[in-house]
Amino acid sequence: MLKYKPLLKISKNCEAAILRASKTRLNTIRAYGSTVPKSKSFEQDSRKRTQSWTALRVGAILAATSSVAYLNWHNGQIDNEPKLDMNKQKISPAEVAKHNKPDDCWVVINGYVYDLTRFLPNHPGGQDVIKFNAGKDVTAIFEPLHAPNVIDKYIAPEKKLGPLQGSMPPELVCPPYAPGETKEDIARKEQLKSLLPPLDNIINLYDFEYLASQTLTKQAWAYYSSGANDEVTHRENHNAYHRIFFKPKILVDVRKVDISTDMLGSHVDVPFYVSATALCKLGNPLEGEKDVARGCGQGVTKVPQMISTLASCSPEEIIEAAPSDKQIQWYQLYVNSDRKITDDLVKNVEKLGVKALFVTVDAPSLGQREKDMKLKFSNTKAGPKAMKKTNVEESQGASRALSKFIDPSLTWKDIEELKKKTKLPIVIKGVQRTEDVIKAAEIGVSGVVLSNHGGRQLDFSRAPIEVLAETMPILEQRNLKDKLEVFVDGGVRRGTDVLKALCLGAKGVGLGRPFLYANSCYGRNGVEKAIEILRDEIEMSMRLLGVTSIAELKPDLLDLSTLKARTVGVPNDVLYNEVYEGPTLTEFEDA
């Protein structure tokens, strides 16, 4: 069993403490991984991930990543290589370096020179990420999170100036960059990545979370793990499940247990799905969401995957990566202020074969995700000091940079209009009150997801499981229960959490962060392992509960008497508390 060492509160000014902590972490993982040999395929995947890890050291890409989905939206081609004329006259590094101003901005990407001057105002991630790197080789910023063929979509042929002659001098090459970390921090994490325990030793979803917390860059960890403000809702999403208890039946023949069910017209192996999460390449630089697709479809148990609008990979890449044509993939949609872009995107993913649209409605403005904001957007070696001379919002963090294009004027009327434009089932994602579930049923959408964005939006929103317990009896009273399917996500870490939601009437249960962490550490094999863990926990708990099918899960199997008693202490979840890292206070600058 992994020992969750309290390693995170290390004095930054004490080199000896850092060395001791590093040694402790390494010894912990060495001991943990010593009992079971790694499989050949795992070792190969591990080497690939380790080799690629340095490609992730990018701070400025987080401001550029709002363009990831935006630029991938129109990627109708599977061929991801940009169309370049290599016969054009070569351009010297000295010439590139002259064009280093906002009104005269050239950059180098993968050995080719581009004039981005006219593109600057239209860059969804803001001008500054390009402007501060004008006259430089920006490959390390561009490549990890952009499909190469986005260049063809947004850069006119005449702005593709020609191949670079030789290479840019080191001082004009944007370095891999990890805000808030020293070279020693990065080296230690790379070493830890090479010492990950074999998957056979991973026995619960918290193991993935712990390993990710120790190996991800600070910026990636902050983006993945952060919640809004004081993170009360982030914690409450999970803690609410601990205020629900079971009332198991006995003397039931449970030799055969069937956990398959139906969701949105498709038969599925399990009652849970991988919820949409942005920027998987922050944790898995080589494959990103493509490995999630593979992990969801390569094993015995197939799991629906919800593809994010803000994915690091294009919809084409993710769908093509699915091991089987029968694999179920849904699409999570942020509605763009430019509705034509949204309309084109919907047509595209429908043509690609997704089975449903999940329209996110809880993000008219991005929440105050302070852990993310602490690692301020920085584009140059000079960092924030240089940026203070501009009007860039230094403290926006990755989340704020990502939110630029989302339409804050979205209304119920827009949902009804969207229904007319697609044959796909439409599910409203981010519903947080019973009255809105009733409204959704009345306008005829196919489903809702009770969700507060993983506690990343309005702090002190209620836990989705609590909203579910309140909502389902009212839907039944109004004869609306069969009008739409109700899903729930947020805070789920155990098979018992899934069963509690199903007992209360949920059609399916979504998990996001656990699969992010599994993918970050082990790629597709980690995703498959996380699925196996959750599946086994559900099957075991159903036997202990005295039921053999999803249809037998009813509210009478639960004790809800303390669900709303938020002032009553919940059972101490030791593993959750060990891996949870809350917001921090601002520190003094180094002298």
From Swiss-Prot:
Disruption phenotype: Inactivation of this gene leads to a deficiency in L-lactate dehydrogenase activity and consequently to the inability to use L-lactate as a sole source of carbon. Pyruvate binds at residues 223, 334, 453, 456. Residues 88-165 form the Cytochrome b5 heme-binding domain. FMN binds at residues 275-278, 308, 332, 360, 429, 489-493, 512-513. Its cofactor is FMN; heme b. SUPFAM superfamilies: Cytochrome b5-like heme/steroid binding domain, FMN-linked oxidoreductases. Consists of two discrete domains, an N-terminal cytochrome b domain from residues 81 to 179 and a C-terminal flavin-binding domain from residues 180 to 566. In addition there is an extended C-terminal tail. The cytochrome b domain is required for efficient cytochrome c reduction. This is L-lactate dehydrogenase (cytochrome). It comes from Saccharomyces cerevisiae (strain ATCC 204508 / S288c) (Baker's yeast). The gene is CYB2.
